[in-house]
Every structure is written in structure tokens, then in C-alpha cells.
């Protein structure tokens, strides 16, 4: 791109050095002329054959105010380019997974799972599917938000219901695979239109990827891309959930059974899924102390404190001194340390937010004109390795100790689908004190990360979303 370093985007952001690029645009560092804060600027040629930045900015605008949603600072046309300015974020979960030698501990995965499910739940509550759930599209924040997970890349997002009437999109078949084949749901491979259940099934594959280090359908060879997708589909369909989750806690089997039991239009019980993992977290004696695997690698003293408290809890049956959100927090991973490992947190963000599809994915990013919102003026707008031990045995050998979940929602459902699988009860229940402590820790974690949005900003965001909602409703639901 022929932009100069002294260019000012939207009259507010001074363009800095290029920090990434790909098939769908280029990413630059920028500095706010008003506050001096760094931001990320994504650019694409205004005359590109398949523009997507305007559509993506609309999604960002509609999601503003949600926890773990990057702030959209500005979008518009700058010279010969479409420009979108958003928060500068840290490394992706894929980057951190690689940093941790491609295996995460059960504790880290459970801490992540709670936030990841919440991010997907929020998108769904706003009427959109993500359709490309993968580790690359979840980034950690920077500075005070270094322990918060952000969801990004809405280029493949799709409206699954009318934003006002909540009418669900119709069931369809013979659809092309949209998203990343490695994490795509079975129904997506079979050509079924995606709905909320598919985002959650994809998230389940992400969690098992972190625990196992890889998935059974990785590394398959084929002559063509279509043949490779077919091989991945065959392997995924033929791999029983119990085999995929073997040697890991049965809660993961229950997670997949629930996701696959959902019918096309069913509203998922997100609270049930989070409760599955929260109860497991409590029974394992973990504390919600923000000590992820990458934190422990950078700051061994944090890991030692966490291990000591966990050991004390197992020994006495009482919470360790560090339990709960009010306990002293471990030293957090710094921006500088992140940059040391990943050649810059900025680059880590850049690589995943703008580069084109990798060999194992099939991005159906091209949109027809009727899928793009009508053009408006510029809008201002997570060192114990994965528990692959015999103590869990086969995941199907013991029942899951989880609370009963409500029956399926009262929403309209597609009649053709699989029968519902019931979760079994049993197992050792934690004490009331343990459950109260862990519930408070998890609740405190989420509430702290949301404190950055002050009342005025929420009000302004609400106004922007309402205006965007009205413009979106001028569109027909995407095919």
C-alpha cells in the first residue's frame, strides 16, 4: 500500500508501521492523536473485488459493549482504502498454545472454557453466528486486560435470526463448508445450514485440541482440497465422542453429547455447559487465580504459589489461601514479555486478524451484494500437562456430577434431527463452601473484566447499536 506513515485515519489516528497483512487486507499500528493510545488499523482497497471490511465493521458495531468484544473506534473510507480502527490486542490462543509446547493443562482449559462459551453466547444473543470458531480467532488482551479473552474476525459471521422478530433462518442442506475444516461441526461437513449448535460443537473441538495437543483428523493427506475435506469429514464422523475424549474427564463427553442433541433451531443452555466445567473445576480443587500455563512459564513463582494452594486444598479439603477473586493476584504476563516471545503482541494479533486461509481451512468469504449492509457514511464508532492419565480411564466409565439442566427451549425447532441425549447424574458433589468459593471466583473474574466500560460509553454504544440494528433490518436474511 502506498499510504504514508504520517497519514491520519479519520482525522483521529496517526498511521504507524505495517504490522501484518494477508489476502483480505493489511494491518497497521496507529496512535490516537487525542489520547496517545495505540490501536490497530485494518485496511483494504476500496475497489477490491470482494470487500468485507464494511460488513465486518457493522458486526463489530452491533456487538459493542459486550465483554471480550474489541472496541470499534472508527470505520470509513480513507483515500483509496476502506479503514477500520479497533483495539490493539495481544497474542491469540493458537500463539499461546504453541508457546506452551502445544499442550494446555486441564486447569487452563477450564478457565478458558468459561470465557469462550460466554463469548459465543453473547454473539448468539445479538443474533449472529460466528461460523469460524478456532484458537486463532480468540485473542488475549493487553495490560490490565491480559487475562481477558477477546473474540475477533467476524468476516464469516451470519445473522441467524431477525433482530427484532427473532424469526430463525430456515433449515437447508447442500451448503458448502464455511469456516475451518479442522473445527467444523459434523453437520457442517454434511452440508447442513449452520446454527447455534454448530458454533458450540466447534468450540468443543477447540477445547479437546488444547488438551490433546492435536485432533485425530489432523495431518490427513489428499490430492485435492475437496478430497482432504472429505477425509476430515469421514474421520470426524467415524470417531466416537468417547474415543475423542478418552482419558479426559467425562464432562467433555457430556458437552459434545449435549451439542449434538440440539435441533436446528434450539436455543442452547449455555449455563448448563458452563456449569459442567465449573463443577469439574471445583472437584479438581483448582482456584480461579488467573495463572494460565503461559503465565507459569514466564513467572514460575506464580505457578509455585498456585500449586501450593491447590495442594493445600487437596490435603485439607479447604480452599487454599489464594482461593477466590479477592486473593492476591499473581504477577501477570506483561506486554514486553509477550512481544519477546511472539516478535510482538502486535504481530500476533496481525497474523490472525488479516491473513488468508491456512491449508486446512476453507473460507467462504466472498459475499454477494445483497449480503452486504447498505453503504452508509463513515461510522464513528489464559506446569501440569493435559491430564492424559489413567485416573479418568474411559470417559464413559463414570457419570458426570452435574446439575440437571432444563428441557429444551420453547423456541421453534426443526423436526428433522437426532434424538436428545440425556446427561446422567451421580459422582461426588463438592461441599457447599467449595461451590460458593468457586462460584464467587468465577463471578468476580467476569465482573472485573467488564468494569472498563463506563456508563456513558455503554449509553453511547447502545445508541449506535440501535441505529445499526435499524439499518440491518433493511436487509433480507443472508442466504
From Swiss-Prot:
InterPro entries: CK1_Ser-Thr_kinase, Kinase-like_dom_sf, Prot_kinase_dom, Protein_kinase_ATP_BS, Ser/Thr_kinase_AS. Residues 302-479 are annotated as: Cortical microtubules-binding domain (CTD). GO terms for biological process: cortical microtubule organization; protein autophosphorylation; regulation of cell growth; regulation of unidimensional cell growth. SUPFAM superfamilies: Protein kinase-like (PK-like). Residues 328-337, 454-465 have a biased composition (Basic and acidic residues). GO terms for molecular function: ATP binding; protein serine kinase activity; protein serine/threonine kinase activity; tubulin binding. Keywords: ATP-binding, Cell junction, Cytoplasm, Cytoskeleton, Kinase, Membrane, Microtubule, Nucleotide-binding, Serine/threonine-protein kinase, Transferase. The active site is at 132 (proton acceptor). Residues 390-410 have a biased composition (Low complexity). Residues 13-282 form the Protein kinase domain. Pfam families: Pkinase (PF00069). Residues 302-337, 350-465 are annotated as: Disordered. Disruption phenotype: Abnormal cortical microtubule organization leading to anisotropic cell expansion. It catalyses: L-seryl-[protein] + ATP = O-phospho-L-seryl-[protein] + ADP + H(+); L-threonyl-[protein] + ATP = O-phospho-L-threonyl-[protein] + ADP + H(+). It is found in: Cytoplasm; Cell junction, Plasmodesma; Cytoplasm, Cytoskeleton; Endomembrane system. SMART domains: S_TKc. ATP binds at residues 19-27, 42. It comes from the Eukaryota. Changing residue 132 to N: Loss of kinase activity and constitutive localization to both punctate structures and microtubules, leading to disturbed cortical microtubule organization and polarized cell expansion. GO terms for cellular component: cell junction; cell periphery; cortical microtubule; cytoskeleton; endomembrane system; membrane; plasmodesma. It is an enzyme of class 2 (transferase). Autophosphorylated. Monomer. Binds tubulins. Belongs to the protein kinase superfamily. CK1 Ser/Thr protein kinase family. Casein kinase I subfamily. Casein kinases are operationally defined by their preferential utilization of acidic proteins such as caseins as substrates. It can phosphorylate a large number of proteins. Phosphorylates tubulins and microtubules in vitro. Involved in anisotropic cell growth and cell shape formation via the regulation of microtubule organization. This is Casein kinase 1-like protein 6.
Amino acid at each position: 500500500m502506498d499510504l504514508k506513515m504520517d497519514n491520519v485515519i479519520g482525522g483521529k489516528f496517526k498511521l504507524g508501521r505495517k504490522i501484518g497483512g494477508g489476502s483480505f487486507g493489511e494491518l497497521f499500528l496507529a496512535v490516537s492523536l487525542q489520547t496517545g493510545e495505540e490501536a490497530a488499523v485494518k485496511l483494504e482497497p476500496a475497489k477490491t473485488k470482494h470487500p468485507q471490511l464494511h460488513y465486518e465493521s457493522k458486526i463489530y458495531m452491533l456487538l459493542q459493549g459486550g465483554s471480550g468484544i474489541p472496541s470499534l473506534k472508527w470505520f470509513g473510507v480513507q483515500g483509496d482504502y476502506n479503514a477500520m480502527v479497533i483495539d490493539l490486542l495481544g497474542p491469540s490462543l493458537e500463539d499461546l498454545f504453541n508457546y506452551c509446547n502445544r499442550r494446555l493443562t486441564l486447569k487452563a482449559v477450564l478457565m478458558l472454557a468459561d470465557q469462550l462459551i460466554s463469548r459465543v453466547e453473547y454473539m448468539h444473543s445479538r443474533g449472529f453466528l460466528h461460523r469460524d470458531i478456532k484458537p486463532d480467532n480468540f485473542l488475549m488482551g493487553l495490560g490490565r486486560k491480559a487475562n481477558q479473552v477477546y473474540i475477533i474476525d467476524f468476516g464469516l459471521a451470519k445473522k441467524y435470526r431477525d433482530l427484532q422478530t427473532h424469526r430463525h433462518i430456515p433449515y437447508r442442506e447442500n451448503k458448502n463448508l464455511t469456516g475451518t475444516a479442522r473445527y467444523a461441526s459434523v453437520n457442517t461437513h454434511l452440508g447442513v445450514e449452520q446454527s447455534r449448535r454448530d458454533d458450540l460443537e466447534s468450540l468443543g473441538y477447540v477445547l479437546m485440541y488444547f488438551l490433546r495437543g492435536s485432533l485425530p483428523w489432523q495431518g490427513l493427506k489428499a490430492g485435492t482440497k475437496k478430497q482432504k475435506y472429505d477425509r476430515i469429514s469421514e474421520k470426524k464422523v467415524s470417531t466416537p465422542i468417547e474415543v475423542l475424549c478418552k482419558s479426559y474427564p467425562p464432562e467433555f463427553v457430556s458437552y459434545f453429547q449435549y451439542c449434538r442433541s440440539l435441533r436446528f433451531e434450539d436455543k442452547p443452555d449455555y449455563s448448563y455447559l458452563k456449569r459442567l466445567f465449573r463443577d469439574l473445576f471445583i472437584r479438581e480443587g483448582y482456584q480461579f487465580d488467573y495463572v494460565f500455563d503461559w503465565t507459569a512459564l514466564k513467572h514460575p513463582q506464580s505457578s509455585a504459589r498456585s500449586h501450593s494452594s491447590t495442594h493445600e486444598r487437596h490435603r485439607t479439603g479447604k480452599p487454599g489461601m489464594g482461593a477466590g477473586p479477592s486473593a492476591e493476584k499473581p504477577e501477570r504476563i506483561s506486554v514486553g514479555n509477550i512481544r519477546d516471545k511472539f516478535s510482538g503482541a502486535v504481530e500476533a494479533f496481525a497474523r490472525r486478524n488479516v491473513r488468508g486461509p491456512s491449508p486446512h481451512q476453507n473460507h467462504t468469504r466472498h459475499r454477494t451484494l445483497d449480503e452486504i449492509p447498505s453503504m452508509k457514511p463513515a461510522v464513528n464508532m489464559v506446569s501440569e500437562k493435559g491430564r492424559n492419565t489413567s485416573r479418568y480411564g474411559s470417559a464413559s466409565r463414570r457419570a458426570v456430577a452435574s446439575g440437571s439442566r432444563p428441557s429444551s427451549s420453547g423456541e421453534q425447532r426443526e423436526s428433522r434431527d437426532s434424538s436428545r441425549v440425556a446427561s446422567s447424574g451421580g459422582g461426588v458433589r463438592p461441599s457447599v463452601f467449595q461451590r460458593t468459593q468457586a462460584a464467587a471466583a468465577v463471578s468476580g473474574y467476569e465482573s472485573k473484566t467488564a468494569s472498563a466500560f463506563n456508563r456513558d460509553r455503554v449509553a453511547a454504544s447502545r445508541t449506535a447499536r440501535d441505529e445499526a440494528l435499524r439499518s440491518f433490518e433493511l436487509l433480507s436474511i443472508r442466504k
